Amino acid sequence: MKKVVLFTLLITGLSFAGEQKEANESMILFWKAVNTVILLGLVYYFGGKHIKKFLNGRRENVANMVLEAQKMREDSQKALEDAKRKLEEAKYKLEESIKISKETAEREREHAIMQANEIAERIKMQAKETINIEIRKAEAKLKKYAAEKALEVSKSLIESSINPQTSNELIKKTIKGLEA
């Protein structure tokens, strides 16, 4: 029923506004205002629910967007803090790795020095042993040479100092020494 009344008022207002071309301007202004009020009333009547629904939906949508933006901001803050924490952990692990690497390198260096010293000591011992062996060989050769020379000298002395008479006496003494 309300719809019919409003529609009738609209039609009437439009017809009055259109008929009075010769009327004064105040009447035209009045009917324009009436038409505007009627138009706004019709828009409100027919579209009020939809407009309210749209505006409420828009308000809720904006509120949800604000809440979502706040949540995203909080999440990004948490992610930033987490990234900072992970960066600090990575720095700490890197420092620990460097420290361990330096300690390992130092131990390896000391171990290498110790092994080199042991090898040098073994080489010294082998050299001393080789020198001692060579000295003994040289002494043996020298003794052999000295014995050979002594024999040669003795032989030549004996041959030059022994004559047949001395030779017979020596043979007799040796035989007597063997018999006894």
UniProtKB/Swiss-Prot annotation:
Domain of life: Bacteria
InterPro entries: ATP_synth_b/b'su_bac/chlpt (IPR002146)
Transmembrane segments: 26-48
Compartments, as annotated in UniProt: Cell inner membrane
An annotated Gene Ontology molecular function: proton-transporting ATP synthase activity, rotational mechanism
Family affiliation: Belongs to the ATPase B chain family.
Protein role: F(1)F(0) ATP synthase produces ATP from ADP in the presence of a proton or sodium gradient. F-type ATPases consist of two structural domains, F(1) containing the extramembraneous catalytic core and F(0) containing the membrane proton channel, linked together by a central stalk and a peripheral stalk. During catalysis, ATP synthesis in the catalytic domain of F(1) is coupled via a rotary mechanism of the central stalk subunits to proton translocation.
Record note on quaternary structure: F-type ATPases have 2 components, F(1) - the catalytic core - and F(0) - the membrane proton channel. F(1) has five subunits: alpha(3), beta(3), gamma(1), delta(1), epsilon(1). F(0) has three main subunits: a(1), b(2) and c(10-14). The alpha and beta chains form an alternating ring which encloses part of the gamma chain. F(1) is attached to F(0) by a central stalk formed by the gamma and epsilon chains, while a peripheral stalk is formed by the delta and b chains.
Record's protein name: ATP synthase subunit b
